[in-house]
Amino acid sequence: MGARDCTPLLMLSFLLFPLGFPVLGAPARLICDSRVLERYILEAREAENATMGCAEGCSFNENITVPDTKVNFYAWKRMEVQQQALEVWQGLALLSEAILRGQALLANASQPCEALRLHVDKAVSGLRSLTSLLRALGAQKEAISLPDATPSAAPLRAFTVDALSKLFRIYSNFLRGKLTLYTGEACRRGDR
């Protein structure tokens, strides 16, 4: 076996060698890197700031239902993990519906602003990514495992907004509040 015959075998072994090592930053743990969530929070804040002074084209011709982002820290700490997961999962689903509805309303506006459309598109993409990351973390399984008969399983609190700036404020607050609290605790448990 000459040197040329060994080259393909050597190259193949170099390609397969890394497969024996655990992947750092695998998707299930990616949400545990604080920089990942901080990036989504920054995008949400930028969208919120961009729409704060906006009057023209930022109001909706209908109300959009969004999750309540207020957190009672005393109650949150005493909540079962499954209840926290359910609240975050339902809130994320409702927020995704709201952003998608806002996107549709913006697309149907007479003169949609391209910058606003870009922020909404980023929010849609960000929420899809966050949903995937939470699914990999096990939030959906924890939320589903909560028995329906549990008395602590209160319905998700929600209200309506009528402007893009309010929608982005809710988006930003949800990421900084309930989502950050849940992912922080889920990552600390380390059993994922």
UniProtKB/Swiss-Prot annotation:
Gene3D superfamilies according to UniProt: 1.20.1250.10
Molecular function terms, GO-annotated: cytokine activity; erythropoietin receptor binding; hormone activity; protein kinase activator activity
Major localization class: secreted
Localization in the cell: Secreted
InterPro entries: 4_helix_cytokine-like_core, EPO/TPO_CS, EPO_TPO, Erythroptn
SUPFAM superfamilies in the record: 4-helical cytokines
Keyword terms, alphabetized: Disulfide bond, Erythrocyte maturation, Glycoprotein, Hormone, Secreted, Signal
GO CC terms, sorted: cell surface; extracellular space
Entry keyword annotation includes Nucleotidyltransferase: no
One of the GO biological process terms: positive regulation of DNA-templated transcription
Superkingdom as given in the UniProt entry: Eukaryota
Known role: Hormone involved in the regulation of erythrocyte proliferation and differentiation and the maintenance of a physiological level of circulating erythrocyte mass. Binds to EPOR leading to EPOR dimerization and JAK2 activation thereby activating specific downstream effectors, including STAT1 and STAT3.
Name assigned to this protein: Erythropoietin
